[in-house]
Design a protein with these regions (language model features):
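C-terminal structural segment of proteins
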Residues: 2-5, 9-167
């Protein structure tokens, strides 16, 4: 089924497995879905606890494994930064580069995020790596979690509500 415009789940099957190139890691999905809402993604994950949630894929590319289901969040509308009266709502799929160059966010936070991502690899990487993936991965070389903690950030999780970031 492929019907993204109505918010339905997209099911795509790959007829042949991806093979390793020059001995590098390969992540393979037996089945791939692209839900249109976070609720659909959550329900799919509840049905299959061995599923892999796919965001920017920067950290997942480091693994060499097969997953029964890949749940791609790119159709869920999580790639926006929204400003409310007293806060910024940052979607999990917002890239580090988007946040780094968001002028109103940078002004409101005295440029803390620009400083936090400055030493992360390069511009190309920051334009692909997501805020949600960075929070989930908690890489030791990344100051992103520290910056978000300093800003008293809370996360909103589908099915669990709003909560503070726990270091």
């Amino acid at each position: 089924m492929y019907n993204d415009k109505r918010g339905e789940v997209i099911h795509l099957r790959y007829p042949c497995p991806i093979t390793k190139k020059q001995g590098g890691p390969v992540l393979t999905f037996e089945k791939y879905v692209r839900p249109g809402t976070t609720r659909q993604a959550y329900e799919l994950l509840q049905e299959n606890r061995l599923a892999t949630v796919i965001g920017g894929m920067m950290w997942l590319r480091l693994s060499d494994r097969t997953s029964p289901l890949g749940i791609d969040l790119s159709g869920c509308g999580l790639n926006k930064v929204e400003e409310t009266e007293d806060a910024f709502r940052i979607g999990a799929m917002v890239t580090l580069g988007q946040l780094e160059h968001h002028e109103r966010f940078q002004a409101a936070t005295c440029g803390i995020f620009t400083e936090a991502v400055r030493d992360i690899v390069g511009t190309q990487f920051r334009n692909l790596a997501s805020v949600g993936g960075s929070l989930y991965a908690r890489m030791g070389f990344s100051d992103i979690v520290t910056a978000l903690l300093a800003l008293d950030t809370e996360v909103e999780l589908e099915g669990a509500g709003t909560m503070p970031i726990i270091p």
